[in-house]
Swiss-Prot record:
Family annotation (InterPro entries): FMN-bd, NqrC
Recorded name of the encoding gene: nqrC
One GO CC annotation: plasma membrane
Role according to the record: NQR complex catalyzes the reduction of ubiquinone-1 to ubiquinol by two successive reactions, coupled with the transport of Na(+) ions from the cytoplasm to the periplasm. NqrA to NqrE are probably involved in the second step, the conversion of ubisemiquinone to ubiquinol.
Catalytic activity line of the entry: a ubiquinone + n Na(+)(in) + NADH + H(+) = a ubiquinol + n Na(+)(out) + NAD(+)
Enzyme class: translocase
Membrane topology: Single-pass membrane protein
Identification of the protein by name: Na(+)-translocating NADH-quinone reductase subunit C
Lineage summary: Bacteria, Pseudomonadati, Chlamydiota, Chlamydiia, Chlamydiales
TM spans (from-to): 13-33
Amino acid sequence: MASKSRHYLNQPWYIILFIFVLSLIAGTLLSSVYYVLAPIQQQAAEFDRNQQMLMAAQVISSDNTFQVYEKGDWHPALYNTKKQLLEISSTPPKVTVTTLSSYFQNFVRVLLTDTQGNLSSFEDHNLNLEEFLSQPTPVIHGLALYVVYAILHNDAASSKLSASQVAKNPTAIESIVLPIEGFGLWGPIYGFLALEKDGNTVLGTSWYQHGETPGLGANIANPQWQKNFRGKKVFLVSASGETDFAKTTLGLEVIKGSVSAALGDSPKAASSIDGISGATLTCNGVTESFSHSLAPYRALLTFFANSKPSGESHDH
């Protein structure tokens, strides 16, 4: 009797229906999981990207704690959420999503520049950051626009400035961070290069996305190797010791071998970095990435290089 009542189990239509229903349920479950996890993944990616940016600017150390520059040196710091300021601390806590987000909101301004070195804000052009980054470089009044991340001075007055105010009068800028992108051995590489207010001296660099070989090319993301960039100059110094910001080579070269052994104290050494053993092609890609990515910023970097220490209005 039971066998007769279940005769349909072997019917083709039942098997097809069963597979369809099972697939529908599985698809619904997977979609639900993706819907729930997508915002979390996006938040994690944003945290990592912003963390890497601030590591390049030395605001966050390789130990994932805040740092603050005072009295001519970097000191371990904590982010005081009440005062919303960095304060020197002998036992700084690890950076969290909350503290990084608060610091970013108060002391990082996302600006725009063009090939003439003019600074502006997204609000000035009625542009949205997310849409801007997902589309080809927009052109306003015949000039392409490029992103600049401005790190502001660690004081209450600077934290209250809008992006438009900073763009019009950049005296509150402590350092700038530029997005760097190019191709390594196995695919695209994305990172940041942070420069001091002089527009020439490197604070640091970081790479937040790459597909290079672990133990070889992947060492571009190793903090120990990245320390080699500190203090380097993006504008090549001439043999006479002078720098022609309008014409000289702009970029950083990762050479094969050691800079001290290959270049000694020659002017080129100031813009060169020790290579990574066994990763020559990746290093060549990094060199090309700096050259290509920095080119549109020459006028802006020249402006900062020629600015007086006291600062001046960016209206030219």
